[in-house]
Amino acid sequence: MAAAERITTVAELKVRIGQELRVSEWRVLTQHEVDVFGELSGENAWIHNDPERARNSAFGGTIAQGNLTLSVVPAMLAAAAGPEIDLGASYGLNYGFDRVRFITPIVVGQRMRARLTLLDVKDIAPGVIHIFWRRTVEVEGADKPAMVADSISRQYL
């Protein structure tokens, strides 16, 4: 097995702007996960947590909360193949999101996967950069993505 590609400098990372760097494996959200997330977050509307009632909805079943979808993406992408990015940062933080859209509902039991595209890298201060990512979640067989989220990671070099 070949060693994974490594990106170790900001210059190497900037060359990859506009490129998709990771695609996760397919994953299915279970009703149990949706129910637990609903209890933790308070997002427990019937469309998420009542399979019998949701069967008669336009979706034909319960749908995952958008915020649950957003929450599982980091783990999906961390497990995905792709270049290892090690800029030698002392630490990095989730700086936030510029835009999050939930476009197509994910019906419980549908397969979904995540894609990660590098949008930009900006120097913020000496030794501090922002990395701008697009996280896209697609549902198998759907014409439109389930979610598109533009996130920012702050790295302290």
Question: How should each PLM-predicted stretch be described?
Answer:
Residues 2-17, 102-157:
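HotDog/MaoC-like acyl-thioester-processing domains
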Residues 2-95:
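Hot-dog-fold acyl-thioester-processing enzymes
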